[in-house]
Amino acid sequence: MKKLLALALVAPLLVSCSSKKGDSYNEAWVKDTNGFDILMGQFAHNIENIWGFNEVLIAGPKDYVKYTDAYQTRSHINFDDGTITIETIAGTEPAAHLRQAIVKTLLMGDDPGSIDLYSDADDVTISKEPYLYGQVVDQTGQPIRWEGRATTFADYLLQTRLKSRTNGLKIIYSVTINLVPNHLDKRAHKYVGMVRQASRKYGVDESLILAIMQTESSFNPYAVSRSDALGLMQVVQHSAGKDVFRSQGKSGTPSRSYLFDPQSNIDTGTAYLAMLNNVYLGGIDNPTSRRYAVITAYNGGAGSVLRVFSSDKVQAANIINSMAPGDVYQTLTTRHPSGESRRYLYKVNSAQKNYRRR
C-alpha cells in the first residue's frame, strides 16, 4: 500500500489540479490529465484503506485538506460552510495528535507553495501572520495570533467539543470549530488591494474579479482541483495560463508556484478575463451581454459560449447582438450544454451584484 501511496503522491509533479476545461488543451496535456485522474483515484482508494469506507477527504477548490502522522490525522477547512474539522484515527494519544493539528491549522500562514496537500509531510509551519487570523475566535471571543492562545484554545476544545465515531474497527476522534459569520468577507478583504491593482491594469471591473474568486475558490489560496486549475481564480496552466503568457510575450506556461502566489494568480486570472472580453468575445456589442458571455466562458471556454448560438463564430456574435441582454442570460443559463457553466453564470452574476452594492 505504501508503494501505491507513493505513486499517487507524485501527481503534483506531473500535472496540477482543476475544476474547469478550456478550449485550447493540447493532446499531451490531456494524456497528463488522464494520468492524474488515475493517480488521484488511487490516492483516494488508499485514503479509504487507511480511514475506512466513506471517509475519503481530498483537497479541492473550497476545501483545504492536509494529512499528517502517516495519514492518520487530518485538518479540513470547508471555506464554503465556514467550518474547521480536525480528525485523527491515531491509536495512541489521539488528543495529542489533535492538539498539534489544531494549533498548526489555526496558525498556518498563507503560502500555499510551502504545503504539499498530497503528502503527510509535516510542512505546516506556524506563522506570525496566520491566514485564519480574525476568521476564528477562541472561547473568550478573541482572535488567535500566538501559539500560547492557540494551545489554550485547543485544550478547551478537547475538553468541551471532542467527539468520536466508529467506522469498522477504527475510532475517529474529531473537533469542529466554526469560523466567524463574516469569514468570507474577511478573506476577501485580504485581496482587495491586489484586485484593485489588476482591475486598473486590465480594465476589468473589481466586482467581477471578486465574484469570480468567490465562486471559484471562496477566497481559498490553497485551492486545487482535479482538472488542472490552481489558486484563488482557479487558473488552468495549460489553457488560460498559457494564453495569458503568450499575450504577454512569455514562453511556456505559468508554474504551480507562480499560480499559487495570490498576486500572480489574480493578475493572470484578470488578464484572461480581459482577453475574453476584448479578443475572444469582442464581437459582442452590448457590454452586459458580453459580460454574461465572458463569465460563462471563464468556466467553459469562449468557443462553447458562441456555439450555443451558432457553429459560426461571426454569426454567433451577430445573433447575440440582435438579442436583449436578458435573453442572452436566459439562453446561456438554459441552453449551454454544460450544467456547470449554466450554474456558474448564475452564481457569478449573483455574487457580482453583492460586490457592486458595497
From Swiss-Prot:
Residues 1-16 form the signal peptide. Gene3D superfamilies: 1.10.530.10. It is a lipid-anchor. One of its GO terms (biological process) is cell wall organization. Its main location: membrane. GO terms for molecular function: hydrolase activity, acting on glycosyl bonds; peptidoglycan lytic transglycosylase activity. Keywords: Cell outer membrane, Cell wall biogenesis/degradation, Lipoprotein, Lyase, Membrane, Palmitate, Signal. It catalyses: Exolytic cleavage of the (1->4)-beta-glycosidic linkage between N-acetylmuramic acid (MurNAc) and N-acetylglucosamine (GlcNAc) residues in peptidoglycan, from either the reducing or the non-reducing ends of the peptidoglycan chains, with concomitant formation of a 1,6-anhydrobond in the MurNAc residue. InterPro entries: Lysozyme-like_dom_sf (IPR023346), Murein_transglycosylaseC (IPR023664), Murein_transglycosylaseC_N (IPR024570), Transglyc_AS (IPR000189), Transglycosylase_SLT_dom_1 (IPR008258). The keyword Phosphoprotein does not apply. Murein-degrading enzyme. May play a role in recycling of muropeptides during cell elongation and/or cell division. HAMAP family: MltC (MF_01616). This is Membrane-bound lytic murein transglycosylase C.
